[in-house]
Amino acid sequence: MGLKRFKPVTPGRRFMVISDFSDITKTEPEKSLLAPLKKTGGRNHHGRVTVRHRGGGHKRRYRIIDFKRYDKAGIPAKVLAIEYDPNRSARIALLLYADGEKRYILAPKGVNVGDTLMSGPDAEIRPGNALPLEKIPVGTLVHNVEFTPGKGGQIARAAGTYCQIMAKEGNYALLRMPSGELRKVHIKCYATVGVVGNEDHKNEVHGKAGRVRWLGRRPHVRGVAMNPVDHPHGGGEGRGKGHHPTSPWGLPTKGYKTRRGKRPSDKFIVRRRNEV
């Protein structure tokens, strides 16, 4: 996969950098692995905005991804295609298992069409294979890591991300998260060996506001440009905030810690990300 740059024939093209999609081998998705996807516009079931700056965008269909893989332990799978997924930054790989079933997984870096992948405790340590953490050597880079055994991968699923196994002690493995946090994870949790593909995603530049709107994101308006009824920074003569910077709901921002204390998972965090 590479990046594509453009000549500045228009203002929107001047700084635009996008993927050349050279790693995509199949343009139409597998119909049996599609599901309808309803837009929320950032609203919850009460109809209230819970995520600002969301709405519009191109229509999408959800690709059903296998984040668990342990139920296919010992069954080899051949990579049929590498596909684009509009719902995530990573590419997805279409697998055909020896028993005839097709499934999507996150496409790891270095996995190509025709490769054979495996999951289970006895799988080989190579990119794309899924194993319990107890079977993966210390120092290995992994992605799609489970937090709870059997729940499916939740950590390191975005393009170019990974966790590193730092140590093992008792029933827990010590993992360095993409954020830099050191955290204990149960050794029975599954993880996929390797790094998530499409690493150049972080270097893409949209070039114009319209491309961002296609992705379903609306303009991010500054608080000082609003009226007092809409934001604590609103109103006044000129552009002054008048007080310490706050969020739209009045909480201090720029350094104020908002993480809820005494969470049950605190005992698994060895070192917080901001202590690195």
Curated annotation (Swiss-Prot):
Output the GO biological process annotations, alphabetical, semicolon-separated: cytoplasmic translation
A Pfam family found in this protein is Ribosomal_L2_C
Ribosomal protein is among the record's keywords: yes
Q: Name the segments for region: Disordered.
A: 223-276
Composition-biased stretches, type Basic and acidic residues, lie in 230-240, 263-276
Instruction: Tell me the superkingdom of the source.
Output: Bacteria
Ordered alphabetically, the record's keywords are:
Ribonucleoprotein, Ribosomal protein, RNA-binding, rRNA-binding
* SUPFAM superfamilies registered for this protein in UniProt: Nucleic acid-binding proteins (SSF50249), Translation proteins SH3-like domain (SSF50104)
SMART domains linked: Ribosomal_L2 (SM01383), Ribosomal_L2_C (SM01382)
Q: Name one GO cellular component term.
A: large ribosomal subunit
Q: Which InterPro entries match?
A: NA-bd_OB-fold, Rib_uL2_dom2, Ribosomal_uL2, Ribosomal_uL2_bac/org-type, Ribosomal_uL2_C, Ribosomal_uL2_CS, Ribosomal_uL2_dom3, Ribosomal_uL2_RNA-bd_dom
> Which molecular-function annotations from GO does this UniProt entry contain?
RNA binding; rRNA binding; structural constituent of ribosome; transferase activity
Similarity-based family: Belongs to the universal ribosomal protein uL2 family.
Briefly state the protein's biological role: One of the primary rRNA binding proteins. Required for association of the 30S and 50S subunits to form the 70S ribosome, for tRNA binding and peptide bond formation. It has been suggested to have peptidyltransferase activity; this is somewhat controversial. Makes several contacts with the 16S rRNA in the 70S ribosome.
What the entry lists under HAMAP family is as follows: Ribosomal_uL2_B (MF_01320_B)
Subunit-level organization? Part of the 50S ribosomal subunit. Forms a bridge to the 30S subunit in the 70S ribosome.
Q: What is this protein called?
A: Large ribosomal subunit protein uL2
Q: Which organism is it from?
A: Thermotoga maritima (strain ATCC 43589 / DSM 3109 / JCM 10099 / NBRC 100826 / MSB8)
